[in-house]
Amino acid sequence: MAEMFCFQCQQTAGGSGCVRTGVCGKQPETAQLQDALLDKLVRLAQACERKGWRPDEVTELLTDGLFITLTNVNFDDGAIRAFTQRIDEMLAWVDAPTPEKDPGWLWRGETDLVSLRSTLLFGLKGMAAYAHHARELGYTDSAVDTWFYKGLTSLAQPHSVEEWLELILEFGRVNFQCMALLDQAHTETFGHPVPTRVNTDIQKGPFIVVTGHDLKDLRQLLKQTAGKGVNVYTHGEMLPAHGYPELKKYTHLVGHFGTAWQNQQTDFADLPAPVLFTTNCLMPPRPSYADRIYTTSVVGYEGIPHIPADENGHKDFTPLIQQALSLGGYETDQSRGGLNGGHMLTTGFARNAVLSQAPAILNAIKSGAIKHIFLVGGCDGAHPGRNYYTEFVKRTPMDSLVLTLACGTFRFNDLDLGEIHGIPRILDIGQCNDAYSAVQIALALAEAFDCSINDLPLTLVLSWYEQKAVCILLSLLALGVKNIYLGPTLPAFLSEPVVKMLVDAFGLQPTTHPQQDLDAILQRG
């Protein structure tokens, strides 16, 4: 009998599911606790829907509860039990009925229906992350909040294949609204990103590394470290922070440390500085750096110090600052490059920055200087086939642009591909949620050429790993974007008939070989 079951991430064991221990490091007891939490979130949503209640405190619990179960977020059984206790108290408050089945119902049933139910569930987990970040900055959307109740309740209801597909596409539209909300939260709070060059070398002296996605946490840390002789470096998907005016104004935000999340156990080894995890992706810390790791928000790992927020959302990062000063950092400047040896990265090409150059881009397309635009991005991971994305970008023709976002960009963002009429060929849009920016750019180009997105010389080549990538894909499909290339493998939770439906309806295509796919896209024989 399986000790656990989880198939929500791209690296799931054998391409079918983790049953003894998670490839991510999740242990069976943690998986069981997360399943029990998910079951109770569904019951809580059902009870509130029956009463017509959607109180803010319940909405926050539903959102954060889903976020906790996202891949590489929380491995702390004690923290998960404590959060589940809060759900139990709320279940009693809303007078929810006694459960009739064990949490394993989530993964049982007819294969295609389980596939579709899982797709919606994993999409909800991704949207929960975005809604959480927006709410932390004071931004909410009633349609998004309502859909957490609807989506969770729908998971426990019987639906035909057609009804599941309709629900999933409806979710995709709502998730796009959620990404728009987070874009609004980020740009109104921190300003519109501007193109910014970021150094990967590390200066001597005390420093702190910040990883994850939470810009509010980064701002609080920057305020608390100002004038204390402690530099701050971003890591992973915090790289786009350098483009936001209200963050880049801090002169001690000096650069970017390391590469993508899956290399952290090597990158952080013997690091003479503390690391703050604001969200995923957290891997089980190794002894060589475990005493310098801190978590906050929904992130957790047993034995790792956690920085809580007070009732006003304030966090005291004094322990990190003191440890940074005590460790002292490197004694000399350190030369560190990206995966391809480059030492400078460029970020900040979000919708406002790119659309400010729209006339130049349009003229370049009309003149033939730009013949194709690729969006190559998404999650990175340790799967051997992910070098596909490096090779694909290297092989793109000189008359093409490469838009990129999320941690998949680290496969190639230190490459110098040159420029077209002063426009860099690689344009880093931002974090995974900035897929909203990418769509806005595409819509603006489509409007300028009086055509649909699918008629543009534009191809999406996406990499996925966890559930935020799932919700983004569902939003793109809901918007009618077709012929997306997806890799390095298709999700294990998509059954063969469901894959066929997506291929037939949307032209979804698994990646094959970089040159083969590139030739097919550019219709080269």
Q: Each predicted region: which residue ranges?
A:
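Anaerobic metallocofactor- and corrinoid-dependent redox/one-carbon enzyme cores
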Residues: A2-A13, C18-V19, K26-T30, R43, ...
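Long, compositionally biased, glycine/small-hydrophobic-enriched stretches that function as flexible linkers
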Residues: A2-H192, T196-G205, V209, G229, ...
